[in-house]
């Protein structure tokens, strides 16, 4: 069975390739160019495809590169911009995994003769006695990426390989040092690959996106206490960056897009009982879900016990304990007690 290994040039994907090679797997390297060359790219920086291709040549591995920049702009970047225009907080990494890495890149791998696509994600793929193929949280809690894969179609995940699921990041780095192998592009990837410096505000300004302007900041009691810089710059639950000195810490409670009002309040106003989602991706039939399940609505959040009802148009999540309001546009990932991913959906808003 031939396996394509998605190579970004960094530590994780390189070690995934090495592990498969050491297992005797029939592999080739595959790099996707998701972004056009930057006009301000420093002259000394290597072209990623050339650097990765040279590394594969040293390892005796065939290498292919595919240009998916136009598709990435349409499927990931354009929706990212539109989400901010309408006041949501998008999750482009989850969208990219669903549409690009395990969408078009997997298609490219299959066209090149691969049966599966391996990536450097820290997530486990297991065969469950009742559910068949399942996705499970990675062994490294600090690097687990199951949350970002919860929107990937089950049939696509069945064609994936995740060699790093049982590894921790520090182990991966140590093993590369032991093997005296340096990644061609060793710097850690930034949070959003197409946003320089992870500064989404500057990115949107540079794109000359027409965004809602300033408006009033109003407390939950209806008192105007300041002005915001545009609702797109704020997220539910946010505390920092409000620019207001107040008698108590203030948080963003909600965004009134129709009236361009930012509603703020104390921590006691952040008690969301649940959330609604759309674009639901079921990895396990809800009829087979266990009684005890939990939900993550943010990447760094520990899964929170909840009840989840799946309907024709989405999921309704009801937390056991009140939570910080889930941000519209983010992902709600559903887990069982062992960390198997049961479903994912895009958050419409808190309830």
UniProtKB/Swiss-Prot annotation:
It is found in: Cytoplasm. Disulfide bonds join 96-193. GO terms for cellular component: cytoplasm. InterPro entries: MnmA-like (IPR004506), MnmA-like_C (IPR046885), MnmA-like_central (IPR046884), MnmA-like_central_sf (IPR023382), Rossmann-like_a/b/a_fold (IPR014729). GO terms for molecular function: ATP binding; tRNA binding; tRNA-uridine 2-sulfurtransferase activity. Catalyzes the 2-thiolation of uridine at the wobble position (U34) of tRNA, leading to the formation of s(2)U34. Belongs to the MnmA/TRMU family. This is tRNA-specific 2-thiouridylase MnmA. The lineage of its organism: Bacteria, Pseudomonadati, Thermodesulfobacteriota, Desulfovibrionia, Desulfovibrionales. The gene is mnmA.
């Amino acid at each position: 069975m031939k396996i394509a290994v998605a190579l970004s040039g960094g530590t994780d994907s390189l070690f995934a390739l090495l592990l498969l090679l050491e297992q005797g797997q029939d592999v080739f390297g595959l790099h996707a160019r998701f972004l056009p060359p930057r006009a301000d790219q420093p002259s000394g920086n290597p072209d990623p495809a050339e650097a990765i291709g040279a590394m594969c040549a040293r390892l005796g591995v065939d290498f292919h590169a595919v240009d998916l920049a136009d598709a990435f702009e349409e499927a990931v970047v354009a929706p990212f911009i539109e989400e901010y225009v309408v006041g949501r907080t998008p999750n482009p990494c989850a969208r990219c995994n669903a549409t690009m890495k395990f969408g078009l890149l997997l298609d490219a791998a299959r066209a090149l003769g691969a049966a599966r696509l391996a990536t450097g994600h820290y997530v486990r793929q297991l065969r469950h006695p009742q559910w068949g193929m399942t996705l499970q949280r990675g062994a490294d809690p600090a690097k687990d990426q199951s949350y970002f894969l919860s929107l990937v179609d089950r049939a696509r995940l069945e064609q994936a390989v995740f060699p790093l699921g049982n590894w921790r990041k520090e182990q991966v780095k140590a093993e590369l040092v032991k093997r005296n192998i340096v990644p061609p592009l060793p710097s850690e990837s930034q949070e959003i690959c197409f946003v320089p410096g992870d500064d989404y505000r500057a990115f949107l300004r540079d794109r000359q996106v027409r965004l809602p302007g300033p408006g009033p900041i109003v407390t939950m009691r209806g008192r105007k206490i300041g002005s915001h810089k545009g609702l797109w710059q704020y997220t539910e639950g946010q505390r920092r960056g409000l620019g207001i000195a107040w008698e108590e810490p203030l948080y963003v409670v909600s965004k009134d897009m129709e009236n361009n009002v930012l509603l703020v309040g104390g921590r006691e106003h952040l008690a969301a009982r649940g959330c609604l989602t759309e674009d639901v991706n079921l990895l396990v039939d809800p009829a087979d879900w266990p009684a005890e399940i939990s939900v993550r609505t943010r990447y760094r959040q520990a899964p929170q016990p909840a009840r989840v009802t799946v309907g024709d148009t989405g999921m309704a999540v009801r937390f056991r304990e009140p939570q910080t309001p889930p941000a519209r546009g983010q992902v709600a990932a559903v887990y069982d007690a062992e960390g198997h991913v049961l479903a994912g959906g895009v958050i419409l808003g808190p309830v």
